[in-house]
């Protein structure tokens, strides 16, 4: 990910497991842009912030236990109430890229 302009504001938010995540927000409108979950090497970009979000489709839906009940999820995409075992779902090439960034031991979690 390359930040082209601006200076997003980090906001620490507690997680269910007692750790924290850092959500980076636009300092003007406070919209969430991306998150870090304890590892600044890996950022999770919010789909709605992309220039063309409709060209990216989700591979998985996570934390569905907190979704609004009127939100319907397609049966064709795996859904999990909490997180999931990425080794069971991610393509080998994606896991290899994560290993290259974090190291094999760290990316196993």
Where is each model-derived feature located?
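A short Gly-Trp-Pro
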Residues: 1-109
């Amino acid at each position: 990910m390359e930040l082209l302009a601006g200076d997003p504001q980090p906001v620490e938010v507690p997680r269910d497991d007692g750790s924290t995540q850092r959500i980076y927000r636009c300092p003007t409108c406070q919209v969430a842009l991306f998150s870090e979950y304890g590892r600044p090497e890996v950022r999770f970009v919010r789909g709605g912030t992309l220039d063309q979000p409709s060209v990216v489709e989700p591979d998985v839906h996570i934390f569905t236990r907190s979704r609004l009940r009127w939100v319907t999820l397609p049966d064709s995409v795996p859904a999990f109430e909490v997180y999931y075992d990425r080794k069971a779902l991610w393509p080998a090439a994606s896991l290899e890229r994560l290993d290259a960034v974090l190291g094999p031991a760290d990316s196993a979690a």
